[in-house]
């Protein structure tokens, strides 16, 4: 089905999004995403979109810089970072491993400021398109203030990464 749709379409990509794992949905684990890609064929236009809320809800602990790094290493081993094409950034109303897809505004959920800062400052995400997919006030979507918060959290995450590298270099 996916291969057929891509065969009939020129000039666009299709990104399969990871899921929170509710019910019988596919795409909760990186192994499931890899199997979906394999089943769909080798079209270079087929990639993966990682959603931060879905990662946490499906059991991937991305609440810290180190945790996100380990999760991305797992993704690379199972799927390949070359297949990662886009991102959805949001916080999660539900805890790690809940398998429930409930988006929250940035910094107001289980990821918190630290998890959102880790996601926003991840070097392997640097050139990927990212959709701010948050409910916002009265479920009207992201606000200018939330975009400004994302910019601050990105800088905070980058500073934390620099401090971590400096500590590592000092120990060496």
Give, region by region, the residue ranges found by the protein language model.
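Short Lys/Arg-rich cationic patches that frequently serve as NLS/NoLS or arginine-rich RNA/DNA-binding motifs
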Residues: 155-172
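C-terminal helical cap(s) of enzyme catalytic domains, especially alpha/beta-barrels
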Residues: 140-160
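Gly/Pro-rich active-site loop or hairpin
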Residues: 26-34, 56-127, 135, 141-144
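Alpha-helical membrane segments in multi-pass integral membrane proteins
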Residues: 47-54
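Short strand-turn motif at the edge of the Rossmann-like AdoMet-binding core
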Residues: 19, 53, 134-135
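A structural motif corresponding to the C-terminal end of an alpha-helix
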Residues: 4-14, 40-45, 78-82, 118-128, ...
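Active-site acidic/histidine proton-transfer and metal-coordination neighborhood
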Residues: 1-47
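Conserved, mostly hydrophobic/aromatic
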Residues: 14, 51, 87, 130
